[in-house]
């Protein structure tokens, strides 16, 4: 849903600023760039199957604070960041109209590598669940996109699935 229905950049910006502010820390553009570098590397390692998602989310702020010499609990910070991210509900333009149209003609499903609690919260807050037949989240399945095992699991759990008539819409050529 990030980058396809929701504006992840806006949600991330909101969550970063709110979490830093709540901890009385200044989020400068330089700090954000360092975070993005660390986060991007971790997600790339996740996509390659080198690390799991828990390692991604629970080490990025630990690494950031260590690099910056900031005495802050990165794990607790991550929990607060995820809560704030889960409340960053910014739909992309025309998302509802597209969902309304497509859901009347096709069965829609969510397939995501996002953090489960964050994804469920945003779908609920935006009342988007009604458009989807099911939600497939990598941390619940045990395999991440784009691993074939992830998609095989999804396909097995979709009644009357036909890959010749299916379309997956994503925001990344490396993870979708």
Question: Residue ranges of each PLM-predicted region?
Answer:
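Active-site neighborhood of HAD-like aspartate-dependent phosphohydrolases
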Residues: 1-37, 67
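An amphipathic alpha-helix signature
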Residues: 12-17, 54, 58-62, 116
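Short acidic capping loops at alpha-helix termini that bridge into adjacent secondary structure
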Residues: 27, 73, 130-134, 162-166
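A metal-dependent, Asp-based hydrolase signature
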Residues: 41-80
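Substrate-recognition element of Asp-dependent hydrolases with the DxDx(T/V) motif
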Residues: 76-79, 84-88, 95-124, 132-138, ...
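Conserved Lys-Pro-Asp/Glu-containing loop-to-beta segment of HAD-superfamily phosphomonoesterases
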Residues: 144-176
